[in-house]
Amino acid sequence: MSFMVPTTFAAPQTYRLPCPTIQVQTLGPIVPSVWTIVSRYEPFRQLVVQAHLQDFLNDPQTIVTVMAPLCIPTSQTTQLVCTDASTSPTRVSVLDLSFEASLAMVQSVSVPGVLTTDTMNQSNYTAYRTHHPYRMLHVKSKPTILLNNTSHIVVGNVVASNGLVHIVDQFPMPI
């Protein structure tokens, strides 16, 4: 029987180089959330705030695709709002919708998961489930992407940290 004889290896000498202390800065999120992108468009931002869904669109664990319209076909009313006891009330224009109507409108244009324009172009006609209990988003893709036979995508595939945002020209659902 042969046994292996233990061998020793000489480790090279290590030298400690003087290095300055490195300060590490933590940067904020580089890619904005869906709420940050949607809040750039004032009519839809008002609709999301009225539906109290800004925390839902800002949640990093929720992966969602939102079709944000540039205009919303509702009337606006003005309300007197007091921001501070020392200042006089100011007039603010708000959408003339109830909470339930604005919630249904936002839910009907948000699709769970990531839905890119390439995915929409793969078939001629597809219906996608939305966050609304019974409304679907119908997509025709030949020759251009048409949502519910009413609206076109103006800017597509705006990447967010928790999903995608597509900017559409008008609201794709009947109110």
Swiss-Prot record:
> One Pfam family of this protein, by short name?
Fasciclin
Q: Taking every annotated instance into account, which residue ranges of this chain make up the domain FAS1? A: 28-172
Disulfide bridges in this chain: none
Q: What is this protein called?
A: Putative FAS1 domain-containing protein 081L
Q: Which organism is it from?
A: Invertebrate iridescent virus 3 (IIV-3)
